[in-house]
Amino acid sequence: ARITYRSTEPLGAVITGAEEVKNWTLYQGNVWVCRIGNSLFGNYNPYTTYVYGDWYFAGRSKHTGAVYLNDKMLYEAESLEACIKGEVWEYSWEPEDSVYKWYAEQDGEETVIYANFQGKNPNEEKVEINVRRECFMPEKTGVSYLTVSGFRIEKAATTWAPPAAYQDGMISPHWSKGWIIEDCEISNSKCAGICLGKYLDPDNEHYFTYKHVKSPTQMERDAVCRGQYHGWLKENVGSHIIRRCNIHNCEQGGIIGRMGGVFSIIEDNHIHHINNMMELGGAEIAGTKMHAAIDVIFRRNHIHHCTMGIWCDWEAQGTRITQNLLHDNQRPEFAKQLPGGMMSQDIFVEVSHGPTLIDNNILLSDVSLRMATEGVAMVHNLICGSFTVVGGGTDNIVEGVNRARYTPYHIPHRTEVMGFMTILHGDDRFYNNIFVQKWPAESLLIRHDSDDGVD
């Protein structure tokens, strides 16, 4: 039978990964310091754990820990000196907030945290640090048919969650079936807000990053095949509903996941201000980033001010993106491109074979669609941005050799693999769309992935 967890007052009950800190002492200027016994963290210390792994491109410098001032995440400084200076982070989409800094170091059995509060007294404000990796997530897989309704879920020290690795979020069904997450406010995750992703597989865990055994793409193919041996069937995994949630200010993604979100419905959510701090960069960042969105419906979501809006990567088979409003999913002109960051668009469909139906959406950002895929039908959309990288990224050039990205396709409406193939291109259909030319004052410049270049 279904188990329901419900806040008696909408958004009244809070499930948090953070603890309030009131033992700050003035260190220098605007910088205060506190000492936290490492026993508080148990076997996971966010202030010694880096955001890093496969498909992470922005360097190994940011930790999963975070400091919050009045529910806003502070920026991590690379040194105590940088924390004291409190200079603007030139990549931030919200530069006025980027002067609030923190820096942590270890001293024996204690974590020492310095923070620049720009003149505020942290003992008189609401100041928290995240200490827990997740907020609501079963330790074991297969805990199915739960409803989580009406909670505020916030401020967890989540880890970078690429497709060939264990994936966590502040709330996650953890490789199970039939969850309903509804009417929640989900915010201030260091990485992912909601994760519909992958279980821990010790033999497929960041192997490219830490063992250099196979390419990340091959590890993803392995993940699909190994998933068959770990219960990846329609009867066991997926069929979740995420509805009417306000998901914001998470730095990897609002909703992410590989394989565990199949047959799900994601509807009527407000997803916004994702990755606006621009501290994290890599190929897993978007309002929603789903691998293997088999028979997934993205419906009536309002997605804006995200690095990308909806990103369906691999196996977007039977996927429908319908009646969504997407706008302002683009880097502001004043912000520099983060080294390791990605280009921006409303929708990105990548190395899939379809069918992928994109219909009745309003796409208002500078770039509406990025297509490195086949088998897309785009119908009845209002399209106010350009298309970009059409067909690009379907192959990889490795050491001067073309390595085709061959990806799986599945028995219709199932997870069982039918085969693998390369992208043949050309099998895309466009019917009855309205294209609006914005007539920019200057020619539209498409930002590159990972550098400050343009086309």
Positions of PLM-derived features:
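Extracellular polysaccharide-degrading/modifying enzymes targeting complex plant/algal/animal polysaccharides
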Residues: 1-175, 180-187, 193-233, 408, ...
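Glycine- and acidic/polar-rich repeat regions and solenoidal domains
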Residues: 158-174, 190-455
